């Protein structure tokens, strides 16, 4: 989506010398063409990371933009502020998923910040035009401590649940 460039530009406007680590592929190719047009931004393209190293990669960053549901889950577990770039699905089902995720993630936030969080997802996922993106990013960065605390709280909650594999084994053993 071309919206990623606009979002990165706005994030770079809020962060001094922002470093964006991008995994090789079409988005990295597009951003390499834009890198001289985005002030305060440095881009580092890296090869695909093995799954067992992906959590470490996510955890090494202050904020992440992830693609897909598996990456979303991993980003939630490492406790970093995130934006989810969902894969399109039939019948627009991804809009319902984005909306439900944003409602869950921002529960208890002030209404304007909830709306900004939803809107950045709608913009990135092509459900909303990019007008107002500067305002949306500004609201999110003005409330970055809330965003960080929320990310850490969700990570703690998920980590307390334990390993899905072990929970399945425990469940199965209880049935015996």
Regions found by a protein language model. Give the residues of each.
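Conserved catalytic-core segment of nucleotide-activated headgroup transferases in glycan assembly
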Residues: 1-33
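Hydrophobic beta-strand segments of well-ordered beta-sheets in folded domains
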Residues: 16-22, 82-83, 118-122
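A donor-sugar binding/catalytic signature common to diverse glycosyltransferases
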Residues: 48-97
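C-terminal amphipathic helix plus adjacent low-complexity
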Residues: 107-176
């Amino acid at each position: 989506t071309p919206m990623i460039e606009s979002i990165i530009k706005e994030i770079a406007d809020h962060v001094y010398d922002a470093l964006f680590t991008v995994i090789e592929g079409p988005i990295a190719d597009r951003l390499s063409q834009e890198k001289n047009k985005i002030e305060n931004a440095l881009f580092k393209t890296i090869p695909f990371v093995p799954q067992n190293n992906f959590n470490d990669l996510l955890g090494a960053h202050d904020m992440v933009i992830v693609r897909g549901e598996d990456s979303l889950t991993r980003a939630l577990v490492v406790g970093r502020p995130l934006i989810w770039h969902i894969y399109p699905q039939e019948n627009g089902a991804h809009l319902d998923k984005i909306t439900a995720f944003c409602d869950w993630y921002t529960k208890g936030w002030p209404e304007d910040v909830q709306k900004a969080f939803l809107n950045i997802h709608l913009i990135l996922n092509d459900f909303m035009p990019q007008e107002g993106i500067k305002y949306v990013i500004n609201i999110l960065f003005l409330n970055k401590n809330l965003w960080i605390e929320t990310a850490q709280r969700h990570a703690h909650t998920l980590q307390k649940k334990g390993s899905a594999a072990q929970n399945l084994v425990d469940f199965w053993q209880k049935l015996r």
